[in-house]
Amino acid sequence: HLFEERLSGWEAFIEMVKDNQQFVLEQAHIDDLGFWALSPMPDAEIYGRHSYNKGASVVHNLRNYLGDDLFRQGGQAVLAAQYGGALDDVTLEAAWEEATGVDLTPWFDAHIRQPGFSTWVLDSAITAVPGEVPGYVTTLHLQQKLRACENHHDNEPLDVTVWDLAGQREVAQIVVSGQYATAEVVTDLQPAMVALNAEGRLNQGRMDLDYWISETSSLQNLPWVDLRIGCDEINAGDSALVRVEHHWAGADGAPGETPAEMAPYVEEISGTHFWTIDGLWPDEGLLLDARFTYRGGNENELDFALYGDTEADAFLAWRATPADPWVEYPDYEIQMGSAFNGGGVFKVSRLRRGQYAFANGDVSVGVEPLDSENTAEQWVFPNPARDEVNVV
């Protein structure tokens, strides 16, 4: 990966890092027959995907913990001092700490000594009116979610990217710990949108993408985020910024996750993944459509727990913000084919900002019955009919 950065530049490097991280999320635990800590590693899996692919992934995170200069300095010192030797996690940690002067126990505990992944989710961002402190102060409320591990990451450096209404971006950095965290950032730009880890410096249990739209297009397969988006309408001369985060962790309201308010018909919501859609686009004049594909045909697929037996009660759940209840999304239809093969597509005709998750439930519970006493009499003609009918 570092060679690619030197050869082709930062953007190509980050693309390679993301490609590798997506492979790790999708395939490493399948090829290696489970989720494993990098140390100790079972003998049978020492030369597997975890050692090589996830190893590269977490070393990228070490660079984010240390910064470029200290990472380079420390790496060179450790290699020079330990060349030709064998190191376990304890001696490697001591070597890096001696070379950098930084306490790296949080990194080793999070990325080396336990399996799985962590992902940080932005629950809310509130910007105060500028006062005595120069710039805009934004208070962030964050949640850390886990996949296939037990311990939350501590002292984790995290980029916070803000965009103003003109689409300019500015990056600040915070250090956060635990399941829930609050932090503040001060920026010169007035935030119109805020995102975590948009610069790709930290590999997590999530994939993300932000991109600009300036013209209509058919459905496009977006890299990394398992989503197709198209643009049906956009005003001439306008542009829109779209950001997609695909989190490989349970949605709020799933068993073991943060409790969430849900419509009465929601029986279960995905405990494996969900999306956050955000962006800078006008409320009028832009129409995006999307396709969310669910896959539950076998136990290795993310939606097996929801749809492995049947898709009969499948629906697309959505909430505008984490403070809102999960409800059935208003503008979609389901294309399932067979209801018993675990696979299908939620076809969204109008994409909105918010969080999306796959769910099960009898959505007819949310449909209020007609009040027969206050319902006007209606006539349908002709009867019988062949091509059309009239309702009066």
What does each model-found stretch correspond to?
Residues V90, L140-T161, D283-G308:
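Surface-exposed beta-strand/loop patches in extracellular or lumenal glycoproteins
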Residues S118-A195, V392:
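Beta-strand-rich binding/interaction modules
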Residues H1-H141, A148-C149:
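Hydrophobic alpha-helical and helix-loop surface patches within well-folded domains
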Residues A359-F381:
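Residue-level detector of functionally pivotal "anchor" positions at catalytic/ligand-binding pockets or at interdomain
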Residues A166-I174, A323-Y332:
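Surface-exposed loop/edge segments in extracytoplasmic proteins
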Residues S214-E328, R352-V363:
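Self-processing/autoproteolytic domain segments and adjacent N-terminal interaction modules in large
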Residues A110-H152, Y211-A236, E373-A376:
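Surface beta-strand/loop "capping" patches
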Residues V185-M207, G342-S364:
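C-terminal beta-strand-rich structural cap/linker in extracellular carbohydrate-active enzymes
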